[in-house]
Amino acid sequence: MAAGSHGGYRGYEVAREREHDVGVSRRSKEHYHHRHPSRHRDSERRRDGGRSGGRELSNGYSHRRDSPRPPPRRRPSEGRTEDREPGEVSGGSGSERSGERPMKTREPRENGVTRVSKEEAKMSPSKKRKQSPVIWDRNGSQRQARDPVRGIREVDAVVAEIIMHQSHSLPVMSSLSSIGDGHSPMILDVSVDKVQEYEKNRIVDEEEEGYPTMRNILTSRWADAGDEEENVFVPKKKKSVSPVDSIERGSTKKVTSPESGEVLVYNSVRSSSRSSDSGVLQGSANRDLEVEKGDNIDVEKAADDDYPAGHLLDSDFEGEDCRSETPECTRSPRRCINMLQGCRSVDEFERLNTINEGTYGVVFRVRDKRTGEIVALKKVKMEKEREGFPLTSLREMNILLSFHHPSIVEVKEVVVGSNDRDIFMVMEYMEHDLKGVMETMKQPYSQSEVKCLMLQLLEGVKYLHDNWVLHRDLKTSNLLLNNRGELKICDFGLSRQYGSPLKPYTQLVVTLWYRAPELLLGAKDYSTAIDMWSLGCIMGELLSKGPLFNGKSEIDQLDKIFRTLGTPDENIWPGYSKLPGATVKFGKQTHNRLRDKFRAVSFTGGPMLSEAGFDLLNRLLTYDPEKRISAEDALNHEWFRELPLPRSKDFMPTFPALNEQDRRFKKHMKSPDPLEEQWMKEQGNNGDRGLFG
């Protein structure tokens, strides 16, 4: 073929003649009539400003685009074929295009890249990619088709048939011979660059608008795969593909005729599209592949920041498939994190004195060298390191680090020592515990002061129960006080979360003096009512400055309870006879003598309690757990609203903090704790214990 400005279009006509020779053309007027003719009329009105009124000129007469008609035949006077696609416009005469600005032709391609004119360079990238076919009239000038979208897709359909039906006998590059100065023909740019896009969108086109879709983040290849479902089909996901890469991708697909109406079946494209050493990708195709792989590496490097050093990510060649099929493949937790690695060292704290040593740890008063703040440092006992980290300490850390309430002690952080056996919890420092203060006082708390303390205690317990946590060891030594009148609950070593329905738990919880009768009788199905019984014992101790029930054993504890509150039966406590410990025979006590301990008016100096206060205490110490008052109902009790009103925290009595020597020699009357006794027997240590037990 002779080189010239008409070479691209004549090459297209030669291909058309070959198509008619082999009989592979399946185009029909019904196919183009079926594809939404109203869409093309809207496109024409926007392009020509409504001048043609939905009609176009072809060979001297007008017709509507949506009217089915065969392509015009070739005129004898012309030396070439003039078959026109339904989306093309033919120029009738020179006067017909006198009022229009001629369009510049696209220059040939070099290494798969099409050079464009300066006017076209000002267009957006999406418009550069989708250029309209050029139509030549008799005089050699050129005009642009009025509907480039349809024209491109119809040319793509023809060229796709030529490439696939003639590839067995005629190579693609030989059928589309070079023209001019050795550049690729213009038809290759139109066919190969768009044929794959046409195949993917042909079936969906009948339900979509015919105009290019605006690119957004949802169609981006980096869209979050976690928000996609497995069966979602995204036909609008497009990216720039070089011609040679398109041929390589097309060779790996089983493609039916674009007009046969069959669904296109795709084989695996991953290996061919991402293999850089196949020997086929050259020039700009290699550059496109390098950019694509570079993008994958950048994204996965950003995700690699969440993984520890040395963690291997998935192969770059499987990244895109993982995002579209299994979102977990890029988010699977493949790391084992030691939470103690990010903890501060205990050397950053200055030790001041030892506060106490309890059953589950030693407590020090220290100063933070970084901030100068005085905090408490509780060392976790690790004597049984063969069995792993202590479960009691693990539960306490988990609960306290997740809770934030004014009535619950705050754990600021966890620090480590020189070895793995030295682990400390950094807590806010409180000057006193309630038991030590009560033994220092000469007179018991007044009713207004008891109300202030009980309100804070009930608020903290309500917060625990609202978050499905049982403390299971509420006692005066586990309640901390400061000189601002604030009370905080501490020592969550026996606490645990509970659920609904209730599960059986161990009954060996709660210090003996504060243990509920159902636990003493061997019940394993219990709930928040055991904490409310402990609050009743604490309230009575605050009023009387001594323990309410100070038994020496479980049987003695039950006997003291029954002597004060009366012996229960099935009428008072339904299900009492079915408890394991109910077989033990106790002395029959029919009267409740609790009122004898707390008089409404005392002339002997004993504890006083109003009728409303006694009602609250009696409801806290109810035998039946189902009838025992809850923390929320207790907060709304009338006792807190009657005179005398609760005292303000600012006016609560203060006491000097005990130094280490005073704590060492001060003897406390202490409740026998079965857990502590068992711990001491296992460790062979019978020494004295402190306040934080």
Curated annotation (Swiss-Prot):
Residues 1-148, 236-308, 664-693 are annotated as: Disordered. The modification Phosphothreonine is found at residues 359, 506. Residues 13-24, 40-54, 75-87, 97-122, 287-304 have a biased composition (Basic and acidic residues). GO terms for biological process: regulation of mitotic cell cycle. It catalyses: L-seryl-[protein] + ATP = O-phospho-L-seryl-[protein] + ADP + H(+); L-threonyl-[protein] + ATP = O-phospho-L-threonyl-[protein] + ADP + H(+); [DNA-directed RNA polymerase] + ATP = phospho-[DNA-directed RNA polymerase] + ADP + H(+). Residues 349-640 form the Protein kinase domain. It comes from the Eukaryota. ATP binds at residues 355-363, 378. Residues 26-39 have a biased composition (Basic residues). SUPFAM superfamilies: Protein kinase-like (PK-like). Residues 1-10 have a biased composition (Gly residues). One of its GO terms (cellular component) is nucleus. Residues 268-284 have a biased composition (Low complexity). Its EC number is 2.7.11.22, 2.7.11.23. Keywords: ATP-binding, Kinase, Nucleotide-binding, Phosphoprotein, Serine/threonine-protein kinase, Transferase. Gene3D superfamilies: Phosphorylase Kinase, domain 1, Transferase(Phosphotransferase) domain 1. CDD domains: STKc_CDC2L1. PANTHER family: CELL DIVISION PROTEIN KINASE, CYCLIN-DEPENDENT KINASE G-1. Belongs to the protein kinase superfamily. CMGC Ser/Thr protein kinase family. CDC2/CDKX subfamily. This is Cyclin-dependent kinase G-1. It comes from Oryza sativa subsp. indica (Rice).
